[in-house]
Structures are given as structure tokens and as C-alpha cells.
Amino acid sequence: MKKEKSSAMGTPYTFEGRIPLKQAIPLGLQHVMAMFIGNLTPLLIIMGACGLTADAGYGALRTALLQNAMTVAGIVTLVQMFSIGPIGGKVPIVMGTSSGFLGVFKSVTAVLGQGALTYGAILGATIVGGLFEGVLGVCLKPLRKFFPSVVTGCVVMAIGLSLIPVGINYLCGGSGTNDYGSIQNLFLGMVVLIVTLALKHFTNPKGILSTASILIGILVGYVVAIIMTMVLPHTGTAVLEDGSTVSYTYSWVVNFQQVKDASWFALPGIAGFGKLAEVKPVFRVEAILPVAIMFIVTTVETVGDICACVESGMDREATDSELSGGIICDGLGSSFAAALGVLPNTSFAQNVGIISMTKIVNRMALSCGAIFLILCGLCPKIAAFVSIMPQSVLGGAAVMMFASILVSGIQLITKEPITSREITIVSVALGLGYGLGSTAGATSELPYYIQLIFGGSGIVPAAVAAIVLNIICLLYTSPSPRDRG
């Protein structure tokens, strides 16, 4: 099927064409709000695992790497949407630092120990792994037949199912917080959810209040959090296992000190040089092999993200060139990220949820969000203002966005007649595949590399189960209406 024709003027619901900046900027910003925290969190976790903490004297390095994470996300997003030769699928996908590699990176630190050299080994492995994924993208076309709508639908559903608990954790204040699930956190999340739903469904569907409902809901929640910070107590007391008590600051409190301390302007650095001289990429086999395996996993997830994005936002299937270019950008974008000292940069399912819910796919709107990310990298003060937003505010929008990804997967599967074959594939993929991968400890007795691929997330086992069953059904059962069509 042909892509949308380019025109001088477009609408928020067409990929190409210009729209007024008063529309494009807020529509782009709501994508940034959805992914901002998730873009930085993996980097903070891995720097901590490597011992690169502020207390250890790496405060300036951490700031520089966080700055680069925002800059890279913006640049790679622009490449994904506009493409440079075969790099980029020209699809409305937002790119960001992947959390899918956390498990394998932690295992690398367990093998190599803490320190800047270990972080450098992670960067070196990412450079090699990203190039490997780029090759997979070039070779994708012959493999496309293994990804019919029932398979991609299962992958998309698994992505949605895996993200829903993440949204709930945000809503409750963030995993590990002392006031997890507090009334204040739930109240903030519900304010965002109610405002978003009200604007989405009770205002002009084509107006800015409806199309930017997620951004407005988040901003309203942010303002409410600031007001609560001004009028309510900031601290509580937790009782430890030994009976002693400890004081803590509530997770919903907005602290502007980080904004005051941040500088107005800073240029990004390159790994191994200048302010990033301590994290020079090194190439260790112990790191490269497991990371390369995870890039295969990332390829499957990116296929699902692109299929969900195009299907839900453009009402058609993704083309071979879109999938191939998207995966090449995923891989080479990750290598580029490592060259700038940060972790793999891949498609963000959170933003697919926004597209599934709003149907807004305009490239100019998403470009405004990408440019804002680059500005955040160049102006740390702007980044700090966004980063101090309470997680419960984001959670109010996230629970709905992530669930909409699940709905997109259902739409992919049900857009053609459902036969017993499709029912079998979906049932086994989600029941055995997703259930096995998402249940803690289910793979704990299996070999290490099996755990690495299938443990901790139901996405990959669901994809493998769906692909294998689809091949078996094609070989040994009579054609379904989908095959004949």
C-alpha cells in the first residue's frame, strides 16, 4: 500500500505536511513528557551499578552523560522520521535510552566488576551490538513472511501487557519509594487521568484541547503537585524491620533546587574525550556476546513497536522498507549513542501508546518534541525542570497510554477473520510465552543465556512462541482465510 502523499500543509493525523506551530509544539511536548524520565532512568541505574556515583566523585560525569542521553534521543528520533539513506523508517517513532538492556548490563558488571572500565566495556559492546542490529535490519525483507499480523499482534499485546505494571508503578509514586501507593500519589495520578479523559472526549475532537489532552493533563497534575508541595508537609516516617524509624521526603514533593543548580548551557561530549575521558569504549568478549543477543531481542520489540505505530496511527500495515529502515536506525542509533557515552537508543513503546490513543502521527509535531529533547541536552536547566516532575503525575497518563498498546495488538489480530489457528497462536503465545517470561523465577533453573533472553519480560518468549506456531501451522494445516487473502 502506498504511503501518505506529501503536501505543503497537513493535519496532526497525517505523517507528512506542515501544521501550525501552535499545534505542533504542544503535541510534540506531550511525547517528551511521556518518555523523559524513562529515557534517563536506565543510565542512572547502570552508572550506579558501575560505581559511577556522585559520592565517588563522578558527579560531573553523570551530569554530562544525562545531558548526552537527551541530545542523542532527539537526534536519533529525527533520523528515524526523516531518514538518511536506508537509515530510518520514516515512521512516527520516538527513540530513547532502552531499559531492556538493564539485566544484561548488570550481568556484565557482575563479571567485570565496578569502575569506569566496566562502563567502557558496556559502551564497546553497544557499539558492536548496534552494528549487528543494523545488519539484521538490512536482511529483514526475507524474514518478513514470519511476521504476519497475528504474530506482530501477539508481540504488540505482549509489549502492552509488560508496560501496564510500569504505568501502575508510576501512578503509585515509583518503585521503591517509601510512600508507594499513598493517597497523595494516587490523587495526583487520578487528576491527570480525569483531566486527560475529559479533554479527550468532551471537547472538540479536532481542537487543541483534545489533541493535546495528555500534555495538558500532565501539566495540570504538575501544577497540583506544586500546590501540594506549598501547603502540605514534605516528610513522613517509615518503620524499619528492626523497629527503628527513619524520616523520608514524599515522592510527590517538587524540589526546585535541582533547577536552580543546573547551568543554562552546556555542549555534549564524546566518550573518551574531554569531560567524558573517563568512559572510553573498550571491547571485551564477555560483554559483547550477551549484549549482541539482546540486540536480537530489541529487533523483535522494534518490529512490534513499528507495526503498532503504523497500524494504529496510519490504519495500514508497516511496509518492508519502514521495518528495515526502522531497525537499521535502531541499531546504528545505539552505536551512535555509545560513541557519546550513553546506552542503547531504541524505539519507545510509551510513545507508541500516545499514537495509539490520539492517532496523531504528524512528523512536524514529533520533530518539535525531538528538538525540545536536543534543547534539554544543551540547556540542563530546562531538563531539570522536566526531570523533577513527580512520577505519579506521569503515571496518570501512562496507565491509559500503555493499555492502548494492548488494544492496538488486539486490533492487529482481529482485523481479519479469526480461525482456530489464530486462536491457538494467540493463546499459546500469551499464555505460555508471555506468562513464562513475565513470572519471576520461572526461568531461574535454565542456563544463563536462556534466562537472559527469556527471563524478566514476556515479550521475547511470546514472540518466539507466536513465530514458531505460525510456521508449524503454515506447514501442517490447511490455509486460513488470511493466507488465501
Task: Please name every model-derived segment.
Residues 1-19:
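Short, Lys/Arg-rich, polar N-terminal cytosolic tail immediately upstream
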Residues 21, 47-90, 286-363:
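Membrane-embedded helical hairpins/re-entrant loop segments and their flanking transmembrane helices
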Residues 24-193, 381-382, 388, 392, ...:
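Early transmembrane hairpin of solute transport permeases
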Residues 31, 72-80, 129-137, 156-166, ...:
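Hydrophobic core segments of alpha-helical transmembrane domains in multi-pass membrane transport
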Residues 39-40, 221-230, 240-334, 338, ...:
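Membrane-embedded hairpin module used as a gating/binding unit in multi-pass transport
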Residues 54-58, 108-117, 161-207, 234-274, ...:
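Inter-helical loop and helix-membrane interface segments of multi-pass membrane transporters/permeases
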Residues 85-86, 334-340, 347-434, 451-453:
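Hydrophobic alpha-helical bundle architecture
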Residues 476-481:
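Conserved small/polar residues in nucleotide/adenosyl-binding loops
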